[in-house]
Amino acid sequence: MVKCCSAIGCASRCLPNSKLKGLTFHVFPTDENIKRKWVLAMKRLDVNAAGIWEPKKGDVLCSRHFKKTDFDRSAPNIKLKPGVIPSIFDSPYHLQGKREKLHCRKNFTLKTVPATNYNHHLVGASSCIEEFQSQFIFEHSYSVMDSPKKLKHKLDHVIGELEDTKESLRNVLDREKRFQKSLRKTIRELKDECLISQETANRLDTFCWDCCQESIEQDYIS
């Protein structure tokens, strides 16, 4: 049985001369996480199940949906590098004409009847258009629903960075307070021992405050 590419609108078939044309076919990964990323990248919906399409054993994607850098060509048999994700797919708008033409052609072939009965042809055309419209609506809804998830992920990332910054600032302030307290204690002891005058003690105290403030600003910026 000839294998066909599972991507929407792709007519690539695994034929004996495919490799001569530079076309290779690759089964879906056994790693569930990577396979899930493949499926999401395809943006293919299962109209009958009203959900995301799931690959079956033996389903493949052709090399047209991968970048040149995704392949390992060091061995005689070209293979994909570990963990790569397909990224080259036609958009739904671009596929609209192709998909309608393919579905209609398939339905007309299956429903071919004598030329005297035109009603069957009209039914076939109507069903193929309805099938395409349903598929297009599901694909459009899927792409729209994906946006809030991405926004939520970005929001969580920003909130996490903000919390980390707050925690870092608190640590800096606590450290500088301890340092300032230690310096003032030393200045007070020097003054009590009459090793420095009151004027010098006041200057050192002011200098200590200015240095601490500057240090806090530098730590916060960095």
UniProtKB/Swiss-Prot annotation:
InterPro entries, sorted? THAP_Znf (IPR006612), THAP_Znf_sf (IPR038441)
Keywords per UniProt:
Coiled coil, DNA-binding, Metal-binding, Zinc, Zinc-finger
Q: Name one GO cellular component term.
A: microtubule cytoskeleton
| Name of the protein | THAP domain-containing protein 6
The reply on keyword Zinc-finger is yes
| Entries under PROSITE patterns matching the protein | ZF_THAP
Where's the motif HCFC1-binding motif (HBM)? 139-142
Residue pairs linked by disulfide bridges in the UniProt entry: none
Q: Which Gene3D superfamilies match?
A: THAP domain (6.20.210.20)
Recorded superkingdom: Eukaryota
Q: Name a Pfam family for this protein.
A: THAP
The opening ranks of the lineage are: Eukaryota, Metazoa, Chordata, Craniata, Vertebrata
Q: Where are the zinc fingers (THAP-type)?
A: 1-89
Q: Which stretches are annotated as coiled coil?
A: 149-194
Q: Which GO terms describe its molecular function?
A: DNA binding; zinc ion binding
Asked if the record carries the keyword Zinc, the reply is yes
